[in-house]
């Protein structure tokens, strides 16, 4: 039986020498691979009390929405600044070279709601840490964070003070595809 890792295409030396590019689109292009990825993420949520699934831009939307559907929960978006039309709250966080800002609608999370945060990948953890801070600022409680892939050795998990689970663990200097 295939594992999720078997569906992840690896492209050596892209976009530069020494990088092992992990292409998540190969999972999405294979119905069995995509179903397996979602099924494995659902298993990580067994017994977790949650009211809302929050997907981080942009691949967190791809994996978060089917999880929300399967679990009968609403799906909310954590987006890059300037992409949401209503009143928002925002959080700026550090990148390796510079900063980035994410935001959520102010009415996306209600006080006391338990939230599962979903993304495709954890590397350094900065984006998800900022997303969790937004959720807490809105009065929500982070129940769990679920990733499809975790890059071992980058210590992103250690940055997060929450229950974190990943479907698969990958090693090496890696960049994943960018869908937007």
Curated annotation (Swiss-Prot):
Homodimer. It comes from Butyrivibrio fibrisolvens. This is Adenine phosphoribosyltransferase. InterPro entries: Ade_phspho_trans, PRibTrfase_dom, PRTase-like, UPRTase/APRTase. Its EC number is 2.4.2.7. It is found in: Cytoplasm. It catalyses: AMP + diphosphate = 5-phospho-alpha-D-ribose 1-diphosphate + adenine. GO terms for biological process: adenine salvage; AMP salvage; purine ribonucleoside salvage. One of its GO terms (cellular component) is cytoplasm. Belongs to the purine/pyrimidine phosphoribosyltransferase family. Gene3D superfamilies: 3.40.50.2020. The lineage of its organism: Bacteria, Bacillati, Bacillota, Clostridia, Lachnospirales.
């Amino acid at each position: 039986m295939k594992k999720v890792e078997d569906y992840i295409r690896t492209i050596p030396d892209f976009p530069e020498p020494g990088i092992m590019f992990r292409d998540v689109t190969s999972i999405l292009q294979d119905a069995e691979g995509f179903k397996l990825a979602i099924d494995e993420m659902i298993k990580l949520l067994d017994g977790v009390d949650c009211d809302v699934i929050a997907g981080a831009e942009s691949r967190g939307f791809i994996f978060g929405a089917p999880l929300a559907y399967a679990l009968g929960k609403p799906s909310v978006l954590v987006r890059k600044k300037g992409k949401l039309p209503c009143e928002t709250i925002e959080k700026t966080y550090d990148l390796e070279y510079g900063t980035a800002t994410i935001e959520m609608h102010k009415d996306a999370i209600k006080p006391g709601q338990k939230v599962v945060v979903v993304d495709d990948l954890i590397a350094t953890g900065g984006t998800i840490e900022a997303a969790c801070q937004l959720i807490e600022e809105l009065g929500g409680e982070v129940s769990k964070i679920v990733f499809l892939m975790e890059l071992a050795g980058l210590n992103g998990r250690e940055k997060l003070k929450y229950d974190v689970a990943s479907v698969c663990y990958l090693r090496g200097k890696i960049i994943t595809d960018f869908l937007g």
